[in-house]
Design a protein with these regions (language model features):
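A short beta-loop-alpha structural element at the N-terminal edge
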Residues: 6-20
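A short helix-loop-beta-strand connector motif used in the catalytic cores of GNAT acetyltransferases and
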Residues: 47-61
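Conserved GNAT acetyl-CoA-binding A-motif
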Residues: 112, 119-131
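Conserved acetyl-CoA pyrophosphate-binding loop and the N-cap/start of the following alpha-helix
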Residues: 102-114
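Conserved GNAT-fold acetyl-CoA-binding loop/helix
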Residues: 26-48
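A conserved beta-turn-beta hairpin within the catalytic core of GNAT-like acetyltransferases
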Residues: 78-93, 103, 149-150
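Conserved beta-strand in the GNAT
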Residues: 61, 67-76, 92, 97
């Protein structure tokens, strides 16, 4: 890994590049998106970023020659306190992604280490993520553990979304 590489916090000026990175991540993770999904994401995601970056969404990036080549998102959520998150502040890691030509340089590890240092500064009680098989050992190596809970991970989705 290049020792001159720095992890930076992305800002409003990075939104176009972040939308591109998010789409690349989603396509790699989910397979091709349909045209209407791409259009919706390109239309709505910039507004989401404008509203949330540096408020409750912290995006860590690595650049090579001014181009973002790796990123990870830390979404901070405040919940009613419980023994599992005693101060109510939790984080969720999303969108850990390195462009294919820049993989195996240690960028994801560097970003995750920086992200977790920020989580400590933000006094998050716990940080969670969903891992692919490819990322599992990286996350274990920076301190994540399997969540052996008595609870089942479940979700609900409406049949259709109400359009704005």
């Amino acid at each position: 890994m290049n020792n001159l590489v720095n992890v930076e916090m992305a800002g409003i000026n990075d939104i176009d590049a972040l939308v591109k990175m998010r789409l690349e991540y989603l396509i790699e993770d989910n397979g091709n998106l349909n045209d209407s999904e791409v259009i919706e994401i390109k239309r709505e995601l910039p507004n989401y970023f404008k509203k949330h970056i540096s408020n409750d969404l912290f995006i860590f990036v690595v650049r090579e020659e001014q181009t973002i080549v790796a990123c990870a998102f830390l979404l901070v959520i405040e919940k009613p306190m419980s023994p599992a998150f005693i101060n109510g502040k939790t984080g969720t890691v999303l969108n850990v992604y390195t462009c294919p030509d820049y993989r195996h340089k240690g960028y994801a590890r560097l970003i995750m280490e920086t992200l977790l240092e920020e989580a400590k500064k933000l006094q998050l009680s716990v940080v969670d993520l969903k891992s692919t098989d490819d990322g599992y050992y990286l996350y274990k190596s920076v301190g994540f553990a399997d969540d052996n809970s008595k609870y089942h991970l479940m979700k609900w989705k409406p049949d259709t979304l109400v359009q704005k």
